[in-house]
Regions:
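Short amphipathic alpha-helical segments
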Residues: 35, 39, 83-91
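Second-shell loop/turn segments in exported
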Residues: 41, 74-79, 118-120
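Short regulatory alpha-helical segment in sensory/regulatory domains of signaling proteins that mediates
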Residues: 46, 60, 90-98
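Solvent-exposed, acidic/flexible segments
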Residues: 49, 79-83
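Extracytoplasmic/periplasmic ligand-binding sensor regions of membrane-associated signaling proteins
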Residues: 94-174
Length: 174
């Protein structure tokens, strides 16, 4: 009986020691794995942000977009057919970046040119973000989570008119 009790005691101590060593090893490996995963995700996020920045710059400087917004600034309202012509243009740009759900183009007076509905920019986001985009003078301003769709993030860029001394021509929202 004493031999059995001694063996149970030794096995119990060995089990406890093995448990603590293995849990420490698993915890260390899990921390390393989480750290590597976070670094990879951060790298992918940085790449996506850079893609969105580049894409919105391309859209904002597109010759057709520039012509439409310049005409709007000069007081000529954009005809419906010209607004429809933005669909293939924006679809082509959206095809390059998988993280973009929509591109929206607004005039200086916050009227939406694309997509084709009459939602105002001021009804979509707070005026503080419009002011931030104006102060950024063409830089992309990250707004945050879209209140209408919590799975998306909003960003806004002021479109500067290249042929009008880089004055404001409108806004591009992603």
């Amino acid at each position: 009986i004493s031999f059995m009790l001694l063996m149970i005691f030794v096995l119990g101590i060995a089990s406890v020691l093995t448990y603590y060593r293995m849990s420490a090893l698993l915890q260390t490996n899990a921390e390393k794995h989480i750290s590597q995963t976070a670094m990879q995700a951060n790298g992918r996020l940085d790449a996506l942000i850079a893609q969105i920045n580049t894409l919105t710059t391309q859209v904002a400087t597109d010759a057709y977009v520039q012509r439409l917004l310049l005409a709007e600034v000069q007081g000529k309202e954009t005809p419906f057919s010209s607004r429809q012509s933005l669909l293939p243009l924006f679809s082509d740009y959206q095809a390059y970046v998988t993280g973009i759900k929509s591109l929206e183009l607004y005039t200086n007076d916050y009227r939406r040119l694309f997509p084709l509905n009459e939602t105002q920019l001021i009804d979509t986001i707070d005026s503080e973000w419009i002011n931030a985009a104006n102060w950024g003078k063409g830089s992309l301003v990250w707004i945050g989570i879209d209140p209408r769709d919590p799975s998306t993030v909003l960003a806004l860029r002021r479109v500067s008119l290249l042929d009008r001394w880089f004055s404001s021509g409108g806004y591009l929202m992603v």
